[in-house]
Amino acid sequence: MRKIQPSIVLVKSICSPKPREELNEVQLNEAAHLILAGEGVINPPILLKTGMDPHTGLESYSVVDGHFEHYAAVRGREINARKGETINAYVIEAEEDEKLFMEQISMFRDRGRGTTAPVATSS
């Protein structure tokens, strides 16, 4: 179906295959405070809808890209459970579409992380 939806997602319904211990806790804490202050994240994580969690009855998601943003949101929820309850994210609806969006991630996000050199203009 090739669809990706901007969504507001409960932080507790997201899991990441990347361990939190691999990330810098000081930076996560700083990012968490920025997310709480801005009431959102400027670089939303990309999530794959994985189904219904049998324990909570909530839709569940797995991080495809944006593990740092996800764990910063988790830290934000630890700091302030009410303000950090949700995060804006892009949600891939179907697993068969993950490969297509991974190609986009590779092209748009991994390509220098937006740090390309300015283009010279002639006068």
Regions flagged by a language model, labelled:
Residues 81-123:
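Amphipathic, charge-rich alpha-helical segments that serve as recognition/docking helices
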Residues 1-85:
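Short, charged/polar connector segments at secondary-structure boundaries
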